[in-house]
Amino acid sequence: MTIFDNYEVWFVIGSQHLYGPETLRQVTQHAEHVVNALNTEAKLPCKLVLKPLGTTPDEITAICRDANYDDRCAGLVVWLHTFSPAKMWINGLTMLNKPLLQFHTQFNAALPWDSIDMDFMNLNQTAHGGREFGFIGARMRQQHAVVTGHWQDKQAHERIGSWMRQAVSKQDTRHLKVCRFGDNMREVAVTDGDKVAAQIKFGFSVNTWAVGDLVQVVNSISDGDVNALVDEYESCYTMTPATQIHGEKRQNVLEAARIELGMKRFLEQGGFHAFTTTFEDLHGLKQLPGLAVQRLMQQGYGFAGEGDWKTAALLRIMKVMSTGLQGGTSFMEDYTYHFEKGNDLVLGSHMLEVCPSIAVEEKPILDVQHLGIGGKDDPARLIFNTQTGPAIVASLIDLGDRYRLLVNCIDTVKTPHSLPKLPVANALWKAQPDLPSASEAWILAGGAHHTVFSHALNLNDMRQFAEMHDIEITVIDNDTRLPAFKDALRWNEVYYGFRR
């Protein structure tokens, strides 16, 4: 994915004419220097574009209006270099619909103790200019992020870069189209929800296409294209004897390749970047898409099983956020437990569809084995274990009056034994703070059995996501205590009830 190449972030300097043209000239010089340095040295995911100074209400309003209508603009970074009276910002901020970050910095790192005078003081007023800007944001109840630190500080760079990822993700989400092949798994509650409310809140659209429409595209794929893709499989994966040429399951691999090519063509033609399937709605497909889904996820598509469009959309969003970061992000399900005093574990997996981006093996195993659900031919799938280390699992649920994001911090561990009879990819983890507390908190908060698993993102990333989209977040980590967690759920009911 090269999605960050499609966007830029505008760097806006707030000032005023009170200090005279010489001060404004120096402000402009400083801004040019800082933007050039950040673009060159800070390893930001997006390019910063310096805009003209905002020194009057009309100038500021024009910048905000232009940002709204420029599809390449993912958001604004504002630096209050001098004091910039915040009433000048009201009209612009009222209309601004792009993410906003205040960079609370100043050009100099150290004070020039021997030479500091009032000219220096008037030029470098971030300390109180930023507070004036912060007041108007609070007064207007406008969500915006704040990063404090010198512009050469690596931690400030990382925080700005993290915010940029969120800003780009939000713009991508506004254009996201989710395709559901078939409907929801019958009688399942948590995977359903209000698609209209989701489009109003997040911007992504969700619509259903008959599986027959997909089958028509799958059947149009040429044998030559199928064989070329299977050649790619041969080079990327460890093929079991049954899947190799003349193997008894070779035809199943060919059919999986045809499904992958058909799915990708369908998604590309429709402009979809997330999709769902369900094993109860496979009419015309010879097998449940497993290998196809795994590979499409690795290419950046969002996915969830059983018609779970919220998790599919969340996976796409988190894939965009984590583009270029170390570690993978995948669809996941809490499947079964290992209870052992002091070593409780969760085994996560799904019927087939776990993304290879989280695999520890360089070449996962490609195999075809029986699947007792769905009533179709044995499906192809990739089998692998997961990288170890800190990770998160996240779930987005519809509570009717609002959306709630649940995040559990986890520690992925190595599987202590081989799993010779488990023919699916899997992840094994310890839930924070412990399995009883984590599972009870998750259940009390209504968390889904489907999640997005990520090594690339962390809790701070998901907090930013929730803040930027103005949704509730509940966190389960090493600091979680059930009595306080229950209290927080009750307080949230009151808070969000008042906001209706």
Swiss-Prot record:
UniProtKB keywords: Arabinose catabolism, Carbohydrate metabolism, Isomerase, Manganese, Metal-binding
Residues annotated for Mn(2+) binding in this entry: 306, 333, 350, 450
InterPro entries: Ara_Isoase_C (IPR024664), AraA_central (IPR055390), AraA_N (IPR055389), AraA_N_sf (IPR038583), Fuc/Ara_isomerase_C (IPR004216), Fucose_isomerase_N/cen_sf (IPR009015), Lara_isomerase (IPR003762)
Pathway connected to this protein: Carbohydrate degradation; L-arabinose degradation via L-ribulose; D-xylulose 5-phosphate from L-arabinose (bacterial route): step 1/3
SUPFAM superfamilies per the UniProt record, alphabetical: FucI/AraA C-terminal domain-like, FucI/AraA N-terminal and middle domains
GO cellular component labels: cytosol
Molecular-function annotations in GO: L-arabinose isomerase activity; manganese ion binding
Cofactor note: Binds 1 Mn(2+) ion per subunit.
Enzyme Commission code(s) on record: 5.3.1.4
Names of the cofactor(s): Mn(2+)
Record carries keyword Cytoplasm: no
Catalytic activities: beta-L-arabinopyranose = L-ribulose
UniProt-listed Gene3D superfamilies: 3.40.50.10940
Domain of life: Bacteria
Disulphide bridges: none
UniProt-listed GO biological process terms: L-arabinose catabolic process to xylulose 5-phosphate
Family from the record: Belongs to the arabinose isomerase family.
Function in brief: Catalyzes the conversion of L-arabinose to L-ribulose.
Complex formation: Homohexamer.
Full protein name: L-arabinose isomerase
Name of the gene: araA
